[in-house]
């Protein structure tokens, strides 16, 4: 038998198989083998959206996540949330892994666990060509315009103004005098530092208010609860009010008060306007909170980076106040709580993702 016979069916099958593989390999860059290897090429051909944030158990971040989910669904593209659980190394590693998984075909909206984390995250994104928006935390010496076009924007709060506003509501509810205790977030977080500065500013304006103690509860209701229990034992009737740097800690404080039958008797304030805090204002157990609209942040952070990636927005042509800015807050008290509840708690918040600058409250100010 002649094994060199050109009509040998076995030889023809082998030649056809080789030609198919060679042809597929030569066209791989153009995506011609997508039908042969759909799983391998999914990341390259499909844009992915991702929000990176602290925790799904925190009501604020759960709402932030829903904002991201809604934006991705509106674009009919996949959404892959990343939860740091307050661990900087995990947050950075998860972003690095998602960049690799998507081959950089990614739009990212990140709340860095700590300010220092932002530097590593931004450098990773720039290297991979990933468009990114950051929320709250970054070093003061880093600016989006130095990393154009990939670092699209940084959104922050005027923490001092927000912290002072809720403190003022608390002090007025106390009649302008008496002792308070205060719960802070993570000491190195920009929001925590700013909000504490706001409390200090309010204390200077109300000389008859005495700060009995200040402790960090790391934004957590679970950590706030035993701290407030201890304060109630230590200070007793000296406590006339409780200031909290966020509402999750405020809910921990409120639970401690409920356990002693003091809910509603000792006024409490916080920040973030989570649903439980809004409900507590309605019942009179909570005095005030401030909304920074995490649903909007979760949506708009992705919308900004997506617009830059698709060419609808050129970050390099935008003024600095569109690259780093404070978001406009809303103070919630008994006077407007029902309207806020109807529009932002009972109903899904309305977000115009084409109005990039509608909630800009001004450029970020630095102390140094």
Predicted regions and their residues:
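N-terminal secretory signal peptides
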Residues: 1-19, 26-35, 39-42
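Hinge/cleft segment of the Venus flytrap/periplasmic-binding protein
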Residues: 45, 183, 187, 202, ...
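Extracytoplasmic "Venus flytrap"
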Residues: 48-67, 71, 75, 79-94, ...
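Beta-alpha junction/loop-to-helix N-cap segments that form part of ligand/metal-binding clefts
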Residues: 85, 90-142, 157, 248-250
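Hydrophobic alpha-helical segments within soluble ligand-binding/sensing domains
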Residues: 91, 153-180, 224, 273, ...
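Hydrophobic alpha-helical
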Residues: 108-130, 199, 212-213, 217-280, ...
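Flexible loop/hinge segments that line or gate small-molecule binding clefts
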Residues: 121-161, 179, 274-282, 286-287
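Flexible loop/turn connectors
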Residues: 263-264, 269-332
């Amino acid at each position: 038998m002649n094994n060199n016979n050109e009509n040998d069916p076995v030889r023809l099958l082998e030649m056809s198989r080789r030609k198919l593989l060679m042809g597929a390999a030569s066209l791989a860059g153009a995506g011609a083998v997508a039908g042969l290897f759909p799983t391998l090429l999914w990341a390259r051909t499909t844009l992915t959206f991702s929000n990176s944030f602290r925790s799904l158990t925190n009501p604020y971040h759960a709402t932030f996540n829903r904002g991201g989910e809604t934006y991705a669904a509106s674009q009919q593209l996949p959404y892959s949330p990343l939860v740091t659980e307050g661990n900087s190394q995990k947050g950075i590693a998860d972003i690095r892994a998602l960049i690799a998984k998507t081959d950089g075909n990614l739009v990212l909206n990140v709340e860095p666990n700590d300010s220092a984390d932002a530097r590593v995250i931004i450098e990773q994104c720039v290297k991979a060509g990933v468009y990114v928006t950051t929320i709250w935390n970054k070093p003061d010496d880093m600016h989006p315009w130095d990393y154009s076009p990939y670092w699209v924007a940084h959104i922050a709060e005027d923490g001092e103004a927000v912290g002072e506003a809720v403190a003022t509501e608390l002090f007025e509810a106390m009649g302008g005098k008496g002792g308070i205790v205060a719960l802070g977030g993570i000491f190195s977080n920009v929001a925590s530092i700013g909000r504490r500065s706001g409390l200090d500013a309010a204390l200077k304006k109300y000389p008859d208010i005495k700060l009995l103690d200040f402790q960090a509860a790391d934004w957590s209701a679970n950590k706030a609860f035993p701290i407030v229990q201890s304060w109630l034992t230590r200070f007793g009737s000296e406590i006339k009010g409780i200031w909290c740097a966020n509402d999750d800690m405020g809910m921990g404080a409120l639970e401690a008060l409920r356990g002693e039958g003091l809910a509603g008797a000792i006024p409490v304030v916080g920040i973030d306007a989570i649903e439980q805090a809004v409900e507590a204002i309605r019942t009179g157990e909570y005095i005030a909170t401030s909304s920074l609209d995490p649903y909007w942040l979760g949506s708009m952070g992705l919308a900004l980076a997506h617009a830059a990636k698709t060419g609808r927005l050129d970050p390099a042509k935008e003024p600095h106040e569109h690259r780093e800015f404070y978001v406009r807050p809303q103070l919630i008290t008994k006077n407007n709580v029902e309207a806020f509840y109807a529009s932002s708690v009972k109903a899904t918040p309305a977000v115009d993702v084409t109005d990039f600058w509608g909630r800009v409250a001004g450029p970020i100010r630095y102390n140094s």
